[in-house]
Each structure stands twice: as structure tokens, then as C-alpha cells.
């Protein structure tokens, strides 16, 4: 069975939480796009883990994890991440982690270039809100054919690879010197860096497409793990305030390495309220007062897992979520962090937008989203700790009414509701996987 777990909104919906649960019965968990520019948080009996590159399934020793062809991989960051979780007793070796030979390497200059450009824009008051992880530059060079793939590390002594390195470095030094007045990098230093990475990661690099296809054909349970959410998709998100990859479920088999396989299920993950990291239109943050937003931010611990930046927050946005559901084509929905709302007497929900006093019929990522005004409906809250609830019937009637209101607005049943960060704190409503 092939299942994709995707974000419906701007990311940070709690996908890692859901994937960790599904990994209990999975054979393989594979990342299919993005890099280390976002983090999945998983809480286990060993404590809290923040994973930027490693799939959330790495915390299950019987699961094989894959970094797929659609990713851009900062190998220095991956090395540090592996060291960090191994120090906490998590096994990582070529048996349970496989890296696609077709994945793009995030080269040393990509983060440098990202930071320099963000600083240049900031001086003009036009900062983009980049994570400075070099993601856009790695993807840009991928499509310009001006970078290496992981498989090239296995052939560094071949003339064709060394010639490509010369061509790539010549082009990059021209860019960095001409645009940012940086000193050129040497070929010898670059080749040495590549050899160092090959020395560590060569045993992990393989044709993951063949591995995944064999697993799929033999009936293994495969979970494909997305990064970020629909609003950050390069094609269907709020352009240009997007990531540089395709975050949608339709891309999952392709980015993982099995373009000839069809998804059986798509799990769309929603948070019980709205959050966003980075620049761009985000109507939800204008629905309530900044004091209300700050209280929600503190209650939910809403700070970026990869960057530590305070997340922009607001009420649940039904308009944006309907669009995200359409993009992802989800047949299962997981709602996370319902417990964060437990202290509120009333809970706001965004049920519409207006623009210049006229109701906006639907969410359009290319329209004047920075000018829309949210229409808010207030629902009764519940003054009860729900973290101990183990079934739908145990939830307060107001909490159940809140979830059912969202279902009606979205036109889709919600099957999974998390009531706390820990693995066991969730309730099921309807048929789950």
C-alpha cells in the first residue's frame, strides 16, 4: 500500500506526528521533496526529536527510510543530524537509510548565496523571508544542470565528473564574484569536499527507485512524507511566496523514485488553527488582535522547528483549507493540536473572505490575498484538558462540535484528531488507515 502524508496549509501542520503513528505499521518511509528548510517534530518516550532531512520513520528501527530523487540534500547537515540522533540511541546505517543516487546535492555555495541575497534584499526593505538554507539555489542549479547528484559521488575519479565540476565551479565563481564580490573557490578544495562526503555516504547511495518498486510490488506498506504544505507548492502555492519544490501528493511517487506507481491513500494534515512561517499573504493573522495571536502562539509553542522563528498565527482558515484539500486530493484528514484550544472561552473560525466589501467566492493564490479581510464565526470553547481523552465520545461536546463544524465547512470527514504531542494522545473518528 502506498500512502502519501501531506500538508494542507503552509506547513507545520503536524505531519511528523502523523507519520510517526503510521510508521508503526509501515515497512518504508520516504521523503520525496524539499531539503533541510523545514522540520518535523516527533515526541516519543525518548523525548522530542526535530528532523530536518531524515524521514520521521527513522525512529522505528524496523522501518527502512529513504531520501528520494526529488530532494536537495545538504550532506553536512545530514551528517550532523545522524550524529545527533545516534547519540540518543537511534540506529542509522545503510540498512535502514537509503539515499537516492538521483537526489541533488546542496553544494557549499548554495547556503552562502542564499544568505548574501537575503541580506541584499533586506538592505532595500524587500527581504523574502528565506530560511537561508540554500534551497532555492540548489533547485535552481538542478534545473540549470549546474550541480551534482548524489550518484556522482560514486564516480569522482572519472573524467566526466571532474570535467563537470570544473564547469560548475567556473560558472558559480563568476556569479559569486560578479554579484556579491566574493573570493573564488578552488577546484581542489571542492573536490576534497566531495571526496569527504563520498567517504561517509557512498554506502548509503543507491537506486532507491528499484528498492521502492520491489517493496511496492511485494505488498510492503510505504509511506511517502511531504515537507511543507499546499500553500508553499512552487506551482499551486501563493507564488512567489512558495518553496522551490512540489509539495503536493501528486508529485509523491515521482519525487520518491517510483513514478510508475499509483497512490492508494492521501492523508491531508491540518492544524486546529492556522500558522505560517515566512513572508506572503496570510489573512488569518488579521482576524483577531495581536494579543490573541500571541496567546495562541505561546499556548501552541509556535516557533519554527528548523529556524526557531516565531510563527505567524491565527484562527483556522476554512477558505485556504478547502483550496489545500483540493490541491492535495486527500481521502483521509488528520487534525492536530486540538488540545491547544482548550483554554479558550470562544474559538474563532474563518469562514470567508471579503475584498473591498464584496465576498470572495473562492481562494485564488494569484489574487489580492494580501488585501482580503477574513469573515469570522465564533464557536463556544471548552474549559477542559482533553489530553487524556482516548475516544471520540470522551471529548467535550464543544470540542466535538468544533471538529464537526470544520467538517461541514470543508465538505470532508476528519478521521484523526490529536489531543497532545505524545504518540498515544489521539482519538479516531471514522475509518482510519
Each language-model region and where it sits:
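Non-transmembrane, aqueous-exposed alpha-helical and coiled segments at domain scale
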Residues: 1-433
